Amino acid sequence: MSMKIIKDSIHGYISLDPIYSHIIDSPEFQRLKNIEQGSFRVLYPAARHDRFIHSLGTFHLATMFAQHFIDNIKEDLGVTITEGSEMQHSITQIINSFCYAALLHDIGHAPFSHTTEKFFKMKTDSSIPVIDMQLRDAVKSVVSEESFQRFDGEFPGCSPSPHEIMSATILITNANNFLGENIANFDLELAARMVIGCTYDYNKDGNISPDEKLILGIKNCLIRLLNSQTVDVDKLDYITRDTQMSGFE
């Protein structure tokens, strides 16, 4: 499969490597073309953009930010990333996971977008919503017991939207179809954390090495760069896109 280049009215040309081209050709991703970005087309008839192009725009910003992020690590922190080193492998996997999460951060949106989102939070006999249990099960299937216990302890402290929980679950459960033989180059739990905005708690690690602390810091920075209460690549795309497509000045 070859690289795709898509012309976007906001960001210009968006390049996708073969692995991401394969993902956007999937039925799961193509359905986003039928889910509008917002519900304001009644007031702004020109605002006909959808979750498909927004996801591509968010991915594009993520790839740009990731490269600058690596450059800043080297320059500002004085980190040496030697070819073939464990540090290089870790950072490459983190960046891959960030781009993967950015592309799929809205894959869990239902028809009518946020309007029907509340129905995701249905419960069974347990007090825990079904989608929360589904995400926990998905994470448990791809990490060690120790890592799962950590996630299970930190997840309740997050407050993700229902569609974010669904997106995080899908990027794990469909990973074999999306990533194929490249799956080992991605940290699926980290990608899920990025989508739901669930950072790692430093206090749970005791006496960790400087390199381990650095890696955790990098992970948390990129988690916030996709899902935060302030500025992130998701907001940067949809604010710019909504403004231009609605004709708002």
What are these regions (language model features)?
Residues 1-100, 108-249:
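Sequence-structural signature of the catalytic-core scaffold of metal-dependent phosphohydrolases
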